[in-house]
């Protein structure tokens, strides 16, 4: 797969282009008198060192760009890589099946679990079908239906958060967008089974929170979680979306800051260069964290789960 490089990765992109050129020449003419392999190896090492240097000092705005990377793994990618026997369940049994939310039963290391997550698209047609990962009310009602099903069958719930926000269209508002989000917040706080939530990309406002109330909340290293996008915040405070980098820093949208504020529990490290560089390794790390979280929660009674979740929610907003 050919990688898409972000603006701040251009020095890496230039090195990788040189490597690709030399590799192509080597393949075309194996009778060359010069040894290209040594030069390719040297450039690869230099690329790794440069990547490590750049990624050691990323700002909030650069991390926000990584969270939106078009090649970043989505919910269904992690389902394929970390789970077995996934059976997707569709529809809210009231209006429609919202493709921006996917969910179903799967096995995690042999254990039945309910998976629910936002799903963006990659190609244009899929992006439109998935509404760019922005759920309508029927998506959140589908999610709630699956959560209640999981509770009936005593299955842990695992959610993956990756949305710019809930869909703000007129139709969504007419069908009760705010009510659907609010109901999910309330009902998730009452669930009698373990709930583990992980932000895998963008965690945008109420659209993220509607499947984000859990006993454990994790973030991938280069994901974001915020009440509004940096561009939206900049447009309100500075009357210009160009101030988005400044807004990103001020808002505290990245995982280390949110862990410092005790809004999340764990930060899951990503492969060098981001999750899209090695989805298999990222899925393995994610799976290990999910198994560890469920092991911690399995020893708790239903009442303990509910009480801990309540205390967690009530602690928000206090330093």
From Swiss-Prot:
Protein name per its UniProtKB record:
Acetyl-coenzyme A carboxylase carboxyl transferase subunit alpha
Share what the entry says about its subunit structure, partners included: Acetyl-CoA carboxylase is a heterohexamer composed of biotin carboxyl carrier protein (AccB), biotin carboxylase (AccC) and two subunits each of ACCase subunit alpha (AccA) and ACCase subunit beta (AccD).
* Catalyzed reactions: N(6)-carboxybiotinyl-L-lysyl-[protein] + acetyl-CoA = N(6)-biotinyl-L-lysyl-[protein] + malonyl-CoA
Q: Does the keyword ATP-binding apply?
A: yes
Recorded hits in InterPro entries, A to Z, give:
Acetyl_CoA_COase_a_su (IPR001095), ClpP/crotonase-like_dom_sf (IPR029045), COA_CT_C (IPR011763)
Annotated signal peptide: none
Task: Report the protein's function.
Answer: Component of the acetyl coenzyme A carboxylase (ACC) complex. First, biotin carboxylase catalyzes the carboxylation of biotin on its carrier protein (BCCP) and then the CO(2) group is transferred by the carboxyltransferase to acetyl-CoA to form malonyl-CoA.
Q: Which SUPFAM superfamilies match?
A: ClpP/crotonase (SSF52096)
Q: In its UniProt record, which GO terms are filed under biological process?
A: fatty acid biosynthetic process; long-chain fatty acid biosynthetic process; malonyl-CoA biosynthetic process
Which Pfam families is this protein grouped with? ACCA (PF03255)
Where is this protein localized, as stated in its record? Cytoplasm
The entry's keywords: ATP-binding, Cytoplasm, Fatty acid biosynthesis, Fatty acid metabolism, Lipid biosynthesis, Lipid metabolism, Nucleotide-binding, Transferase
Which pathway does the protein contribute to? Lipid metabolism; malonyl-CoA biosynthesis; malonyl-CoA from acetyl-CoA: step 1/1
Q: Which gene encodes it?
A: accA
């Amino acid at each position: 797969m050919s990688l898409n490089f972000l603006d701040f990765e251009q020095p890496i992109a230039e090195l990788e282009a040189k490597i690709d050129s030399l590799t192509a020449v080597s393949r075309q003419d194996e009778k060359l008198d010069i040894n290209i392999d040594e030069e390719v190896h040297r450039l690869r090492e230099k690329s790794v060192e440069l990547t490590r240097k750049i990624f050691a000092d990323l700002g909030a705005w650069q991390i926000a760009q990584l969270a939106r990377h078009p090649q970043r793994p989505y919910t269904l990618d992690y389902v394929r890589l970390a789970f077995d026997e996934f059976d997707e369940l569709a529809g809210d049994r009231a209006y429609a099946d919202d493709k921006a939310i996917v969910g179903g039963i799967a096995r995690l290391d042999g254990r039945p679990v309910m998976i629910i997550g936002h799903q963006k698209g990659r190609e244009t047609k899929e992006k439109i079908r998935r509404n760019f990962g922005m759920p309508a009310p029927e998506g959140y009602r589908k999610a709630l239906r699956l959560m209640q099903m999981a509770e009936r069958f005593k299955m842990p719930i695992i959610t993956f958060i990756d949305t710019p926000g809930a869909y703000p269209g007129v139709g969504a508002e007419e069908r009760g967008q705010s009510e659907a989000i609010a109901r999910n917040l309330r009902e998730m706080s009452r669930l009698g089974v373990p709930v583990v939530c992980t932000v895998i990309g963008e965690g945008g406002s109420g659209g993220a929170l509607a499947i984000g109330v859990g006993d454990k909340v994790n973030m991938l290293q280069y994901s974001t979680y915020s009440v509004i996008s940096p561009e939206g915040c900049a447009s309100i405070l500075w009357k210009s979306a160009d101030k988005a980098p400044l807004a990103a820093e001020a808002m505290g949208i990245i995982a280390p800051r949110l862990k410092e504020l005790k809004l999340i529990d764990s930060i899951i490290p990503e492969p060098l260069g981001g999750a899209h560089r090695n989805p298999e390794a990222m899925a393995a790390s994610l799976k290990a964290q999910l198994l560890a979280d469920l092991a911690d929660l399995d020893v708790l009674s239903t009442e303990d789960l509910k009480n801990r979740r309540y205390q967690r929610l009530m602690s928000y907003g206090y330093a």
